[in-house]
Amino acid sequence: MLVLFVATWSDLGLCKKRPKPGGWNTGGSRYPGQGSPGGNRYPPQGGGGWGQPHGGGWGQPHGGGWGQPHGGGWGQPHGGGWGQGGGTHNQWHKPSKPKTSMKHMAGAAAAGAVVGGLGGYMLGSAMSRPLIHFGNEYEDRYYRENMYRYPNQVYYRPVDQYSNQNNFVHDCVNITIKQHTVTTTTKGENFTETDVKMMERVVEQMCITQYEKESQAYYQRGSSMVLFSSPPVILLISFLIFLIVG
């Protein structure tokens, strides 16, 4: 009788604890994974929650959130965000190397550049053509009208290869007129005797100017070498290096 009474009392207690229809958790949200329709289910039904495989949230593989492999967000490989594989490619690219402009190339071939194929000759800087009077009105007018056809740069070798100014100027005039004549003749333009006479005068003045410029630079370089090779200067430089290193 005692056992029957305990069993009956337990059955009545369970009946009182059963939820009534229409209350909480009846058809609403169930956890985990109950089969009632609707509501948010976890796992793995499609819904909207944090970390779900098919929903829309943070870190989901198919939803729309941050870092998702198929959704739309920042850094996704298939979505439409920054750096994503799909859509427009907003990937970073290495900056293209700057192209060398003609201005920089011209600067590299400035005054003092060794000219290939001329046996060590260098091409001087462009100069203004000197105003020269030839002694008669016809030649003066002819020069003013044709001076643009004459060289404005000279070819020369280093001044230390010549014993005096005359040798430098003579060689400078010959090679400059020869090169200018050959180049101009190749273009279909010929020079008359008057042109050659005027070119010789013009180029001679330019070669003298080039010699003076190169001589001054040469002596300045020599003075600098003598200054830095003197024992007191060497001792001073060594002392400064010792102070810096020490």
From Swiss-Prot:
- Gly residues compositional bias, start-end: 45-88
Q: Which SMART domains match?
A: PRP (SM00157)
> Main location per UniProt?
membrane
Q: At which positions is Cu(2+) 2 bound?
A: 62-64
Q: From the UniProt record, list the residues forming the propeptide.
A: 224-246
Which residues are the signal sequence here? 1-15
Protein's GO biological process: protein homooligomerization
The highest taxon in the source lineage is Eukaryota
Which residue ranges are recorded for the region named 5 X 8 AA tandem repeats of P-H-G-G-G-W-G-Q? 44-84
What information about domains appears in the record's comments?
The normal, monomeric form has a mainly alpha-helical structure. The disease-associated, protease-resistant form forms amyloid fibrils containing a cross-beta spine, formed by a steric zipper of superposed beta-strands. Disease mutations may favor intermolecular contacts via short beta strands, and may thereby trigger oligomerization. Contains an N-terminal region composed of octamer repeats. At low copper concentrations, the sidechains of His residues from three or four repeats contribute to the binding of a single copper ion. Alternatively, a copper ion can be bound by interaction with the sidechain and backbone amide nitrogen of a single His residue. The observed copper binding stoichiometry suggests that two repeat regions cooperate to stabilize the binding of a single copper ion. At higher copper concentrations, each octamer can bind one copper ion by interactions with the His sidechain and Gly backbone atoms.
Family, per entry? Belongs to the prion family.
Protein name according to UniProt? Major prion protein
Species of the source: Cercocebus atys (Sooty mangabey)
